[in-house]
Curated annotation (Swiss-Prot):
Gene Ontology BP terms: Golgi to endosome transport; Golgi to vacuole transport; protein targeting to vacuole
BNR repeats: 378-387, 438-449, 480-490, 724-734, 821-831, 1108-1118, 1150-1159
Stretches the record annotates as Disordered: 1481-1500
GO CC terms in record: cytosol; Golgi apparatus; membrane
Listed name of the protein: Vacuolar protein sorting/targeting protein 10
Stated family: Belongs to the VPS10-related sortilin family.
Function: Functions as a sorting receptor in the Golgi compartment required for the intracellular sorting and delivery of soluble vacuolar proteins, like carboxypeptidase Y (CPY) and proteinase A. Executes multiple rounds of sorting by cycling between the late Golgi and a prevacuolar endosome-like compartment.
Residues bearing attached sugar chains per UniProt: N298, N322, N810, N973
Topological region Cytoplasmic: 1386-1412
UniProt source species: Ajellomyces dermatitidis (strain ER-3 / ATCC MYA-2586)
Keywords recorded for this protein, A-Z: Glycoprotein, Golgi apparatus, Membrane, Protein transport, Receptor, Repeat, Signal, Transmembrane, Transmembrane helix, Transport
Signal peptide bounds: 1-22
Amino acid sequence: MILRRLLLAAGSLLLASAFTSAKKADGPKITVTKFKHEPVNLFYFDDSDVVMLQDGNNGDVYVSRNAGTKWDIVDVGEMKGQAWSLMPHPMDRTKAYVLGKGGKHWVTNDQAMTWREFTVDAELSPYQLPLVFHGKDSNRVMLQGIKCSGRDCVERTYYTTDGFQTLHLLMEKGRHCAWAVSTPMFGDGLDLPKEVNDRIFCVVSGLHSQWPEDNRLLYSDRFFKDDSGIEAGLDSGRAVSGVIRTASAKRHLLAATKSRRTNELALFVTDDASGWHRAEFDGQRIEEDAYTILESTNYSLQVDVVSTDSSAMGTLFTSNSNGTYFTRNIEHTNRNRQGLVDFEKIATIQGIILVNTVKNWEDVEKSSVVEKKIVSRISFDDGRTFQPLKAGKQDLHLHSVTDATNYGRVFSSPAPGLVMGVGNTGGHLKDYSDGDLYISDDAGINWKKALSDAHKYEFGDQGSVIVAVYDEGRTNKISYSFNHGKSWEKASLPLPDDVKIRAKILTTMPDSTSLKFVLVGSAKADSDVEHYVIAIDFAEMEERTCVDPDFEKWPARLNEKQEPDCLMGHKQFYRRRKADANCFIKKKFEDPIPNFEPCKCTEEDFECDFNFIRSEDGKSCVPARSLLAPEGACKNPDDKYTGSSGFRLIPGDACIKKGGLELDKPIERVCSDTMKTPAAGEIAVEKTFFTADNYRDYFYLERTGSSRGDDETVIMITSEQEIFISRDHGKRWKRIFEAETITRIEPHRYFNDVAYFLTNSGEGWYTLDRGENFREFKAPLPPNQDKLPALSFHPDRRDWLIWTGAEECNGSGGQCHSVAYYTTNRGAEWHFLMRYVRRCEFIKRDARGSSDKIVFCEQYEDENPSSKHLQLISSEDWFAEKKVHYNNILDFATMQEFIIVAIRGEKPQDSLSVGVSIDGKTFADAELPANVKIPIQRAYTVLESRTHAAFLHVTVNNLEDHEYGSLIKSNSNGTSYVLSLSAVNRNSRGYADFEKMQGLEGVAMANVVANVDDVEKGAAKKYRTMITHNDGAEWTLLAPPGKDSEGRAYGCSTKGGKPTKACALHLHSYTERVDPRDTYSSPGAVGIMIGTGNVGEYLTPKSSADTFITRDAGISWEEAKKGKYQWEYGDSGSIIVLVPESTPTKTLLYSLDEGRSWKEYQFSEVEMQIRDISTVPSDTSRNFLLWGNEVGQGKKPGLATVNIDFSGLKERSKQCVLNEEKPEADDYYLWEPKHPLQPNGCLFGHRAKYHRKRPEKDCYNGREIQHLDSIGDICECTRSDYECDYNYEPQTDGTCARVPGLEPLDPKLVCTEDPKAIEWYEPTGYRRIPLTKCQGGKQLNHIIAHPCPNKEEEFEKKHPRLRGIGLFFAIVIPIGLAAAVGYYVYQHWDGKFGRIRLGETGSGGFFDRDSPLISIPVTIVAGIVAVATALPLLVSSLWRSLGGYIRVPGSGSSRQPYSSRGAFAARRGDYVGVVDDEDELLGTDDLEDDEEGEERNGQV
């Protein structure tokens, strides 16, 4: 009977209880409990009969104190119905947690006897594990949550050190945090500092960026209380950006990093939370989501790395003891797309591993649709060798982790030597339903069939009892065995009539010492599903307890001679119950204890020492790099010294050296093996000639920070269509694709390692590893004939491509058009996308929805190319459905933050407008500034948009050789544009003279046409160069050097060192470059720029140019050399090379001190005409490549490349030391960029510090360093943090005034566009620069506030009015203070102005204080001064009480004095200025004349 009265009494969903079998002696006691909803999160408290589970539907939690026989609902406080998750503490058998909804949670410290509630002001994070546990102190836990306000969410991490009695905020915006001591074994055997116990590592976003590639790993030993954390020195003590997450594995802590423009990962490992090392995987590439950290040993890490594109197979690696060098164990391991690997270590026994591998791996590598044939393998020597599983003479194959059907381990348990699995014999593994249950009681050496069909199984009483339940369908029986599976009995489950269950879980206590089991299953009852929790107890079936004769000494491992085998220096034995013993062990909660016998040391007890790796044959350890000789040794190369043998005993290995091998005994080594002696100072040169006269193009496939290897790959296509590749930066070249006609090379736009080589037929090749290997692919059509790229690349998915090919273009009479196809596996399979397109592009996923499949296409309207109407359409499902955004566009551009569309107008037909989107779904018309005078908008150039604002060049004059336009800048969503700079030069191809400085945000240079009026009349253009340091809000001329490189003064003069129209530095820009890659700046050389130009009123022809350099981001310049040079940066700016431009030469100039001094070097015996100088795009290499032809006497024909290698130079032969904790202690200093018009050193509202090598230090930077060290003080807002708002324009004094006759944007729109908005502000003419981080100070864009409709209550709470007594004092106190000050001044007038008396002491003088001519005016004046000082507060208070709100930025009144003559002249009737007494925000102090004001603000 179902005891329904229990339901009514308990008020729970517990619907049934206690069906008990009648038999006791010949069958187990079975109790059934029925639940309405599926039980989830079931677990035992270790070493107890206490079991817990959670109702999977209604949030209730249940506990059983008798191993599942009876269940009670946990009804504590408000817990009932509120459980979101239930989990045990993984390392404390007394603790568990109920994580609730709404920030309420509960903890037990006594195995669910009592519960304590704690609250958190955040919801649980859906992105991270909610709880993070300390490995050795169970009271230390971190909780990872998320706090949302509307759509804005901030991740929060909390911590407790007292088991949630108190809870503290650790940090906000932490993406993932972990304790340094994350496992019980971490640090064992090491003398770790005490602070490591408190150490926490957190992955946080970059200082200037939210992109994952800029993530940093910070740590703190003080819970981030007194510091913002120290950046972990992962790579030789240097910080590494792009940290994805951390993970722990027994004795090791790991951090995975990924650089921008690659999907290759670097894995860094530490065993002490201080010293990190990069893990080397024997040449194997590790990619994102392509490795799995497996259950590791106490002395090594085991990692499975994906080895195929489809993630179907991997390679198993095992590390040395410190986790730095990994060796291959077995290839072609079976894995699935979720990262699960068919791998399990046999519990409690060292060295035995079960894996599944793919037998037909060659076929699987060729095609992802081939079905894998899986075979099982076992290792008895810790993965060194593997062999088949044997059931008799047949090979046995078992289902493993990738298709596990039960909780916990798949094959083994703490029961010594007992291993079970579902599988089959034969050539390979079949379906699960075709499998039978097999068992081994000798740890996998021999197997036999236990039961037919697939079963779930579990071990109890240290293996004395084995329980199995049918797992191919429904059942009402269980099977059990008392003799290691030799024979089996069945027991019926006391379920209601005709009820059978499908087994979901079969489990017992974690140590497998109990005679009690729990089975969870479900059964269908009409349309409902019923759930049962079944307790199975064997305790009463066998009364006898085992004694000594019932046990055997069982060896855990046997060698090939069936003798006990050694591992880690000992043999392992267990005292195990004999299979046929008629007894139970009955030692509940006592884990089996192994016994060890020591062995003599063999080769297997040693590993490679630090800085050594296994030789190719695996028999010896060879140096991984040049060895370091002991101090005082190796005075001569032929000397010898005593050093490491290359081996060391594996830490923890207990072998006996006496009488065994001693591979770690020091040996005598020759000094020639040691680190090379200091370089002799030579620069190496390698010249290569080609038959072609010139190169058509070249590309670098550059390694990133997380890439393995040391190659510097260059690919060149010559003027004769020949393809050459060099892996060592042009020292040696190899021709590739000799038999093919490659017509174009398309490097992947987003991944450095990838390039495609295309032909006109549609056949092609690609490389994924920077030219190390090439693979063929076949496109569905030949490339399109629209002179557009055939390939479009996905920003995040390396293998996703769109191919735009030509159809019906072979002269067959059809209508030639382009058709787009897509692939998600690099062309192995192509799928139709759209017909009659011009081009299609993937859209970057970040901030633009959750779909990776967003594609934008330009398609001819009605699929009719003759209409010339291009539609902009998009889709998120490969155009199963599509959305039309615009019907008649000219083009569109996808940028990092915006999608910008040029839309054809209807009247007139050749006009254009602009549409903008930030999410790829919703477009808005761009509001262009009315003060940009454009008769017809005919051309736009979309410029860089990495600073949360888009820059557009809008053509004003489109006549050939007279082109120029306006540079306009958007707000943060790209829709509202303001004029940034007028008359910016462009050429006939649409390129503009505008360039942003690399490595430093907000600095840009542009060339303007200085004689616009004359150009409109047909005159030639004259140019000036302008620079901005606040992202286009203000522009100035370049300050010229005081003297030239020869110490002579220039023929013009500045005003106080400031440039004037008649005397400034002007540089040749983008439109004059042969190669647009030759930029002023470098991402690696922060703050340095080089250009060619002249000092004077205008830019002169390039033939008369000299070369100039700046080291402070353009604030000051100096002449580097007379004449025009090509330049290139190397080693992040520690090497700068100059080569004459357009002049034959044998020599080059180089500088090792940022251009302060130069040395000449001859690189050729014959003069050469150098066409270009190049290096890797990041400018981190010490190699350069010259491209040119010999032209002097003795010349050789053809193109020549010259590799210039500075790595052997003495001054660049030692790597610089960068200590993240003390960044200025060694070879680096911290450089702070500044704004030229800001005395406080602030730039974009903060002070940033960048690592820069000290120029005087003789060392090299090496791989790309993380230049940005920190963001220091956040500055108060000043005028430099604002730009003119829409329909406002800058005046000569720096203020912003409304354009006559135009209205500002409707400020109330914020209320409709943002549902969370409480208030709107009246327009002031100013808006914040999107890039600024300033806080407080001058809020020029927020002066007078008004409530949004229906938000008056929230507005009132934010800005409470003064009422009653508050209002009274606000009025009376200022007046009283004024009177008091006036009276005081009157009383003390005699002492004012330091009056000097010349012997007369009498009073009554004309100017005596008692004179009515003095006393009355003094009192009046003093009172006016005091009242004038206090009245702004009074007026502000009264105004607020009337409903508005005025934020007074300074101590001035609402109507301010004029700051200059220019401001007085410019003020309009509707303009209100805001000026602070201490800092004139809207103008310049004491400008000499209006011209200087113009120059300062860029209005020329």
